[in-house]
Every structure is written in C-alpha cells, then in structure tokens.
Amino acid sequence: MARTEVYNKKKNRTTSLIVFSLAFLFILSSIGFWVVYPFPSDEKVPYFTEDYTMIFEEDIFNKQAMFSNQLYIPYTFIKQHIDSSIQFDEESSSVIMTTDQKVYQMPSDSLNYYMNNSKQKLSFPVLKQENGNLYLASEWLQKVYPMEIRYFKDTKAVQILEHDQILQKATMRATEDEDLRRMRTSPTLTSPYVAELSEGVELFIEKDTKEYFKVRTENGVAGYLKKSVVQLNGTDRIKAEVQANKIPFKPSIEWPVHVTWDGIYQASANPTSQPDLEGVKVLSPTWFELQNGEGDIRNIASKSYVDQAHEKGYRVWALFSNAFEPDRTQKALSTYESRQKMIKQLLQYAEIYNLDGLNLDFENVYEQDGPKLTQFARELTPLAHEAGLVVSMDITFISESAMWSKFYEREELADAVDYLMVMAYDEHWGSSQVAGSVSSLPWVKRNLNQLLQVVPHDRLILGVPLYTRLWKIEQGENGKKVSSESFTMEEAEKWMKERDLESKYDRSTGQDYVEYQVPDKSITYKMWLENKTSLAKRAQLVHQFQLAGIATWSKYFADDEAWKTLDEELSHRKIVQKSE
C-alpha cells in the first residue's frame, strides 16, 4: 500500500472523530442548557374544575358549597375543619351546635331555629338538605363562628378565612416577559399556568419558597410567581363578625375548692340540720338519678337542706347519676330530644331548690356512647351558666377499662364543663382478690401526671377517699379467700382499739397500715388507713399539682379531725421532701 493512501485513511478517521466529538459536545451542551434554562410551558390549565369549590388554609376541597338564593356551606366541611363538636340529630332532622354560652338547634329546611330553646326566625333556612347532603347558610355561620366567608362571583369559588388571620398583601410588578406574568401550578417555569396577570393586580401571599411566592388573586385563583415580579404591600388582618375569644364562666368560689359528696339515697335520709364542716365550701347531695331511657329523672331533693346549707355558708351542687345503668344511659343520650328532656328537668329542679350547681356522675357507660355523653355536657353547660349554675363532672383516672374509663372524652369534657372531679380511689375494689390500699399516694401521683397531660390543672378537682377497707384473708383447703368491707374513720379506730392494735407508717403507700393475725386461725386482717397522715398528703397534692381543689367521698365516712386536717393543709403549702 502506498504511503499516500495510508496517510489519507488516517486523516479521514481523525476528521470523523473530531466531527463526532463536536456533535456530541453540542448535544450535551444543548441538554445542559435546556436543564439550566428550560423552555417555559405554554400550557394553560383551569384552576377550578367545578363551581362553588371551597378554599381553606391554602387548600382546595372537593366538598362544594351550594347556592340556593344564598350561599350554603357543606355540614361535613364545617364538622371536619371548623367545629368537630357540631352534631346532626337524625330523629329531629336537626343540626345541633354549641358555644360556651349558647345551644343552637337548626331543623332542616325550616325558617325557624332555636337558641337556648328560644325560637328565632329568619328569611331563609339555616339548614338545607339537598341530595342527601346537609348545608348550612354562610350568613348564619358568620354570626356564630369567628370566620369570614368570601364568595367570588366570577370564579364561583368560596374562601373561608379565620378571625385574626393575617394576610400578606402584594401587587404584580410590570414586566415585558410573558412567561413571568403567568401563575404556575408549581414553582417552576416548566409547569402549566392557571392565569396570566397584568401590572397592578392585587395579590395575597400564601407561601414563600426559594425563588417563588405562592399567591392568590382576589377571585380565589392561586399559583406561583417569581419573586422578582411581586411587590409586597403590607398586611391585612381578618376581623370576623364574631370574635374567637371564649368568655369563661367564673364560679364565685375561692380557691382551693373543697367539695364533699353527701350520699343520700332516700328522701327520708335528708338530714334535718347541717353540721359545721371545717373548710368545706360545697355540699354535693346525691339527689338526682336517671330513671329510664326516656330521660325521666328521679328526684329526692330537699329545699330545707339547701336553705340550711346556705345559712351555714355552703354552696350546693346537686349530683345527677346515670344509676350506672349502661342500656338506660345509651337510650337517654341517643337523641337531642331526650337529652333536652333531662336538661330541662335539671334546670327546673335547680330553680325550685335554689341550687348553685350540678355535678354529673355517669359511670359504667358503653365506650361508643362516650361522644354522646360529651354532647350532653356541651348542651347542658351553656343553659346552666345562663341560670347561674356551676357544672362539674366526675371522671376516673385513665385506664384500659372500656366502661369505667375509656368512654370519658376527658380533653373535650374539660372544655365543656367548669370542673372535672377525678375519683382518685378504688385502686383496689371491694371485690378485689388482692388486698390493697383504696388509694395509695404513689398511685395517685402517677395517674395525676398522666391525666394532667389532657386536662388543665386549674379545672381538675382531686377526689379524696374518707373511707378505708378492712381486708380479710382466709387460708383454706381450697386456697386463699379474700373479702373486704368498708369502714368509716371512726369504725376503723374502734376496730383497732378493740384488738389493742397500733398502726405503722407504710412508706410504699404513704399511709398508716395495720395487720392482725387471728390467734389459732388462718385468718389475717389488713387495713390501709385514711387518717391525718394520708389526708394531709392528699391535700398537699393540690399545691404540688396546682389543682382546683379536692372533693371528698363521702361526708358520712369522716371524723371531725379529717375536716380540720384537710382545711389546714389546703390553706398552707408545705415543702415536700423528694422521699415522700
């Protein structure tokens, strides 16, 4: 082969390699340029795909409003995003809504509604039903909820804004670049756009990203704009027709509260006179009991009891019990009508007997009925406050027991009533097969710490037992048999004295403890005492946990020293050693 031919082949190969390399570099640089400087999208997409779309907290919701002579908002939207406590009562075909001062009932498709059982008239229905869906009139909603509802006629969209919400105002700057005038669906020029804006268009800033603002126009359309074309112009604050501030009901009673329950189960058992109970401020007689599922209430109250109590300076918060009957309770709580029947009776009794408050004692309730019990409290409290009554409710510590603990919606109940009274006893029930304290101090503290995670300390009253249990443990051929009986303080002292026994302090429970072995028999008695030692510690928990006070169960079990001890300890805070 000639040298010239070889040289030409090498030259052609080199030229091809150079051309290929240049082409590759051009393609690579073009791709890189496109990545760094992408072509803006010219695709326009609709922001609203349906009429009456809801806008709330920057988000769009599929639940649509309805226009029927005026704007209506879906009930389901209000319940999920504005007021979780609003209820629909199927039997009366009404929506029930409560505030701290009012109870509203809105019958479906009616020009009348009820506020605290007083009929109100409107020129439009507050509640409408359409195709199986419920809707509430926006005009009425703005009179009871702290919010502003805006309707944009040109886009047929609805925006809900909350009272005191701050809106960052802005305007569109002038720009010749068409692509920068377009609001994008995401913070990039390659995304589709929903609208093209002109200079001076007023905007509200909803989100600040790295290079973009998410903005919303005055007709509800939202999208992303480059920060360079947005001029910030100060802020607006939403001022709703109704303010968000809750007006608390303040009972005219000094801190710390000391309530004592007065166990009365027959009308004939009402005392004819009231003793002097040192430090006690409130008596709570067990007078009212749910009689049946229709909501009738058994009443054994006494006007002379209240009159004498008032003369002694006591307030009277009468107790209303569900009789611990779950089926009866379920039926009575199931409808607005039956709940109102109970409420009307209680308010009538409160007026007749000149009561100062009501104490709700619902126990042994099906777990699924817990929300209905909460609703009952919500519906009772505003009407009770209107009558000048304090509302308290008894609860247990948090546990896994469905019918004695889990049905209590403690956080919601704390918001519905004035005080929650935690029954801090029955650590060991009377039927327990393990002998133990009614309420050991470490058990109380541990459970208080847990409960105070969901209940405000200044709304919580600590239940204090004034009774003890005498435990009898018998060893027999068939094993161990455990039984108990309740003792008053005086009965416990008498039992010890008859056997010449002295108690010893039990550090593990924070109580005095006594044990007795029956001679020549396989019988042992054990008793964890409620006396000056334990009561002083319990009263100091009010200071330690900054609680509202105590409620003692019950007046019948106490001796004179108990009242004196509790009063002294509630009046003075002590420095508690860690070992205690």
Show which residues each predicted segment covers.
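Substrate-binding cleft of extracellular glycoside hydrolase catalytic domains
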Residues: H310-L358, F362-E363
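Primary recognition of N-terminal secretory signal peptides and signal-anchoring hydrophobic helices
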Residues: A2-E211, I238-I253, R573-V576
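Glycan-binding loop/region signatures in secreted carbohydrate-active enzymes
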Residues: A240, T468-R538, E568-E580
